[in-house]
């Protein structure tokens, strides 16, 4: 309810009057969920070197563009620390007034990284298809992201969306009527993230590949 109220009353006076609600019902539980999931993912996948980051509710004053000073959503991510965060894959959770979302994505990969991923698909399409099928088999996540206006190639229908992505995320949206900030939610997100770990490692490992002949 707080996030709906903030969406409809996005101004400083309203936020300050309801700040305790934000801290108690949104910010605190989100940080606790991030802490618990970071601990579980680190236990399961210590080699990933995951570190959590929780977003701030305050918008950057330089980028308001006529919007209110506060975000009406909150998110956290788990990723290996990097100089440019958006260039590395991360596991994420986001809560908004009407939904929550979770999954894995890479929102600002360099063109070189995506070229290396395409080269991996060219060298070993069977490995790439296996990873894609592992995700598709569950039917839980949808591949989202911007595609190149001019396709880079056609490796077949299964790999085509990945091959021609400029950025990507595997995302699941849920309405807010189910379990919320509970152990059940924590377990649901954790079980959703687990089958995405091989794809995350595959994307991250591509950064160490040699530069391909073609971008």
Where are these regions (language model features)?
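Amphipathic alpha-helical coiled-coil segments
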Residues: 22, 26, 30, 114-117, ...
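Aromatic- and glycine-enriched beta-alpha-beta binding-site module
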Residues: 60-123
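Residues forming anionic-ligand binding surfaces in small-molecule and nucleic-acid pockets
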Residues: 15, 97, 173
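Active-site acidic/histidine clusters and adjacent loop/turn architecture
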Residues: 4-57
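A short, surface-exposed loop/turn module that caps and links secondary-structure elements
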Residues: 43-70, 74, 139-152
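Inter-helical turn/loop segments and adjacent helix faces that build the functional surface
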Residues: 10-17, 108-115, 182
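Long, solvent-exposed, polar/charged low-complexity segments
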Residues: 1-5, 31-34, 41, 141-215
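A contiguous pocket-lining binding segment that forms or flanks enzyme active sites
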Residues: 101-151
């Amino acid at each position: 309810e707080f996030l709906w109220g903030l969406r409809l009353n996005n101004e400083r006076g309203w936020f300050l009057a309801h700040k305790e609600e934000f801290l108690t019902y949104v910010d605190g539980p989100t940080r606790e969920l991030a802490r618990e999931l970071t601990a579980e993912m680190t236990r399961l996948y210590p080699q990933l070197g995951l570190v959590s980051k929780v977003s701030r509710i305050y918008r950057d004053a330089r980028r308001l563009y006529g919007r209110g000073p506060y975000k009406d959503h909150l998110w956290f991510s788990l990723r290996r620390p990097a100089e440019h965060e958006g260039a590395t894959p991360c596991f994420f959770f986001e809560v908004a007034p009407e939904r929550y979302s979770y999954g894995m994505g890479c929102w600002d990969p360099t063109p070189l990284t995506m070229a290396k991923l395409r080269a991996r698909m060219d060298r070993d399409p069977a490995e790439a298809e296996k990873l894609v099928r592992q995700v598709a088999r569950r039917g839980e996540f949808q591949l989202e992201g911007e595609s190149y206006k001019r396709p880079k190639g056609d490796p077949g229908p299964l790999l085509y969306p990945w091959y021609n992505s400029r950025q990507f995320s595997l995302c699941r949206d849920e309405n807010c009527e189910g379990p919320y900030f509970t152990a059940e939610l924590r377990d649901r997100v954790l079980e959703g993230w687990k089958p995405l770990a091989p794809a995350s490692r595959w994307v991250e490992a591509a950064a160490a590949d040699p530069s391909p002949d073609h971008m």
